[in-house]
Structures are given as C-alpha cells and as structure tokens.
Regions:
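Conserved loop-alpha-helix segment in the C-terminal half of the alpha/beta-hydrolase fold
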Residues: 234-257
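N-terminal export and membrane-targeting signals
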Residues: 2-20
Length: 257
C-alpha cells in the first residue's frame, strides 16, 4: 500500500506504456468490428473515435490527486479520463461504489488500480461487459476468498503493521472496525519514500484514513479471470502472487498485490 505519488513519479513511463498496450488491445477489436474488411492501425482507430474511457482508482492513504501526472499525459493524448474518489470504507463497500460509477459510463473502459485500488477494481469490474482491460500498478489482485491481511502476511516487509498504525473509532462502525492512519513518524519511509521530506510530512498530516475492513473483507470472484489484465510492478516493494491471476506485464507476468 505504498504512496501513489512516489510510485507514479518513478514509473510514469511504464504506466503510460502499459495503458497504451491495454488500450490498443481494446481499440483494435473495436475497429475491426466497425470495419471488418479494413486494415486500420491503432492510431487510425483512435482518431476515428474508438478510444476507450480510462478510469483510475487510487489506493490507501491517498486521494485522486495522486493520479495528476498520469491524467495530464492521458488527456494530452486525447483520452477521456475519470479518477473517482475511493471511499476507503472497506473492500466490499468500495468495490460496490466503483461498480456503480462504472455503470454511469457509456462505451468501453480500461480500468486502472494502484495498490489497494487493485483489489477494488478486481471486485468492481466482475460481470461488467464494458470493462475491456485491467491495469494493475503495484497493486493487489486477490483471488476469490482472499483478504488483503492474508496477502500482506504472506510476504514480510509490509508497512501496514500494527506498530505503524493509529486506529481510530468512527460513529456507526461495525464491531472491531476503525479508521486506520499511518503514524506520522512512519509515513515518510512507508508511504512517501523518495519524496522531499517537507512534502512527505505534509502528506502524513493530510492522509485520508482507510477502514480496517479493507484488509479483512474477503475478495469475491475476481474480474481478472475473464478480463485481460496488465501489470506494472514496483521493484522495491514486496509482491504477493494471486495464484491463477493471468495477465501481461513489463516486470512480471501477473498482477501483483
């Protein structure tokens, strides 16, 4: 669950490359459907209006502004882009929230998730015929029945451990559920490694919390079983394999967590 800003600044070219490949995989079949006998290039198909909508889902302890660099590049290339807020209220709730948002979009969608956002897109896109591709950016891609707690425990080195968390109750929370913050002392190294110290400390103060149910809710039938998937992985973070998650990746063959 590393910070989106650090991950994206370091790997923006890789993210854009993965999105280009994923969108090309959507564009080409669409152009072939529209003009079955024509030999169109990806660029020609895109120019003709076949570009999919790209939806970006941020991860834990972050907000939609963490996608700003990616959004700027995609908009410059003529894509329609949405970065809806992730409520961070638990995997079940957050997935339903995103699924409803996706239903408001007409036409094909390339759905992108970072870190915890990968688990959300894994659940939200299941059964949605408009989602044509998934892109995982240093992200979780749990199998059915898995929890993020299980995945985090499977590989040592995660920062999301009790010693680094401040869990605060909130009104109406189910028993045992609270809002988790990364402690301000741990945040710079855990979530903002590579950022200037001043910016890291500001992010520590302004971080949105995530409900602890995000890591305890079991994942449902994964969308990556039926939707083509690509992964952009971080080299410095622990990765957690989701067994049968099939996909494409510049750094690995599967979506990671």
């Amino acid at each position: 669950m590393n910070t989106a800003r650090t991950a994206r600044r370091a790997r923006l070219p890789l993210i854009i490359s993965a999105l280009v490949v994923a969108t090309a995989a959507v564009i080409i079949p669409l152009s072939q459907t529209a003009t079955a006998s024509a030999h169109t290039t990806t660029r020609a198909a895109a120019t003709a209006g076949f570009k999919p909508t790209i939806v970006l889902e941020h991860g834990a302890w972050a907000d939609t502004s963490s996608w700003n660099g990616v959004i700027t590049r995609l908009q410059a290339d003529g894509y329609t882009v949405y970065a809806p807020p992730n409520p961070l209220q638990g995997l079940t709730y957050d997935s339903a929230f995103l699924a409803d948002f996706l239903h408001s979009i007409s036409g094909p969608i390339v759905l992108v998730g970072h870190s915890y956002g990968g688990a959300v897109i894994t659940n939200a896109a299941t059964g949605d015929s408009q989602v044509k591709a998934l892109v995982y950016v240093d992200a979780f891609a749990p199998a059915q029945g898995q929890t993020l707690a299980q995945l985090l425990a499977s590989v040592p080195g995660s920062c999301a451990v009790p010693a680094n968390l401040n869990v605060v109750p909130f009104p109406g929370a189910p028993a045992g559920v609270g809002d988790a913050y990364i402690t301000q002392s741990a945040f710079p190294s855990c979530m903002a490694d590579g950022l200037p110290a001043r910016e890291a400390h500001v992010l520590a103060v302004t971080q949105p919390p995530i409900a602890t149910s995000a890591i305890t809710d079991p994942s449902r039938v994964p969308a990556w079983q039926t939707i083509p998937s690509w992964a952009v992985g971080g080299r410095r973070r622990p990765r957690h394999t989701a067994g049968s998650a099939a996909g494409h990746g510049g750094e690995r063959r599967r979506p990671h967590h």
